[in-house]
């Protein structure tokens, strides 16, 4: 543990990033404060440290470091449209604020205001964590994001990817039309996941 603490406290962003990646695979709740402090320091660096901030945010979400909630909420409120840090914060915010894997209240709260990146991250949490919202919440989410990200330019990933993956474990009658709609868009990764979700099969996500 001392080695990880030293890396988190290092002045080198590469060291901090190494520690954050380690903590995504080796949970250490006792390092919550140090991870948050590391994120705050990295936020004061220039924009080149965005990769490290993303890894720290991923670490926060996976370890369920709830003390970081205000930091994540701040990023979500800024709601930057095309920003990887914001996407990571969206996923982590779902994780630290939910009571269990049926709780999508944070997503519902931001459904009508979230931009591309925030929405991308929040919807990813549904699929990567195989969340199980109520049928009512499923209907609400699908109706709200039916065409979410439709007009994004080339080179951007489809933000509904995580949602499409989550549909594999949901009531088929609630998701069938949505999945067929996603297949029809022609996006190759989404089409692959949607076809498997129609069969009730979870796939390995990117």
Protein language model regions, located:
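Short coil/turn segments at helix-helix junctions and helix-capping linkers
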Residues: 10, 185-189
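Amphipathic alpha-helical scaffolding segments comprising HEAT/armadillo-like alpha-solenoid repeats
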Residues: 1-7, 27-44, 65-78, 98-112, ...
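Short, flexible, glycine-rich and Lys/Arg-enriched loop motifs at helix boundaries
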Residues: 42-49, 77-87
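Structural detector for internal amphipathic alpha-helices that build alpha-solenoid repeat scaffolds
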Residues: 14-29, 50-65, 83-99, 117-133, ...
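Flexible inter-repeat linkers and adjacent short helices
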Residues: 1-11, 18-23
């Amino acid at each position: 543990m001392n080695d990880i603490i030293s890396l988190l406290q290092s002045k080198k962003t590469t060291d901090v990033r190494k520690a954050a990646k380690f903590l995504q695979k080796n949970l250490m709740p006792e390092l919550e404060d140090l991870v948050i402090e590391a994120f705050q320091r990295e936020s004061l660096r220039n924009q080149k440290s965005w990769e490290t901030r993303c890894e720290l945010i991923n670490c926060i979400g996976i370890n369920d470091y709830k003390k970081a909630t205000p930091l994540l909420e701040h990023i979500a409120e800024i709601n930057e449209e095309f920003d990887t840090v914001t996407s990571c914060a969206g996923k982590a915010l779902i994780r630290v604020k939910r009571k269990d894997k049926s709780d999508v209240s944070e997503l519902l709260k931001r459904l009508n205001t979230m931009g591309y990146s925030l929405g991308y991250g929040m919807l990813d949490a549904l699929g990567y964590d195989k969340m199980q919202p109520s049928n009512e919440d499923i209907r609400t989410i699908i109706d709200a994001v039916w065409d979410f990200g439709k007009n994004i330019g080339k080179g951007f990933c489809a933000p509904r990817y995580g949602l499409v993956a989550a549909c594999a474990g949901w009531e088929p009658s609630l998701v069938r039309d949505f999945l067929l709609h996603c297949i029809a868009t022609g996006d190759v990764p989404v089409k692959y996941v949607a076809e498997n979700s129609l069969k009730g099969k979870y796939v390995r996500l990117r």
